[in-house]
């Protein structure tokens, strides 16, 4: 039971980290920050100027 809890916790941390990373990338795309027309903004359908 303890091993399953540890695996669940690990997955939770990893997914949380991925969510934060994607969110930061999305916000940077929307604000038109350092990465100009990025591939992720094209994939999500945001108009690239």
Swiss-Prot record:
Q: What GO cellular component entries does it have?
A: cell outer membrane
Coarsely, its chief localization is membrane
This chain belongs to the protein called Lysis protein
Could you list this entry's UniProt keywords, alphabetically sorted: Cell outer membrane, Lipoprotein, Membrane, Palmitate, Plasmid, Signal
Miscellaneous note, as given in the UniProt record, is: Plasmid Clo DF13 originates from Enterobacter cloacae but is stably maintained in and studied mostly from E.coli.
Report the source organism.
Escherichia coli
The protein's job, in short, is:
Lysis proteins are required for both colicin release and partial cell lysis.
Q: Which chain positions have N-palmitoyl cysteine-type lipid attachment?
A: 22
Extract one GO BP annotation from the record.
Answer: cytolysis
Q: Where is the signal peptide?
A: 1-21
């Amino acid at each position: 039971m303890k091993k399953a809890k540890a695996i669940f916790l690990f997955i939770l941390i990893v997914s949380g980290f991925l969510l934060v990373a994607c969110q930061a990338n999305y916000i940077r795309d929307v604000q038109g920050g350092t990465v100009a027309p990025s591939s992720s903004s094209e994939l999500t359908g945001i108009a690239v100027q």
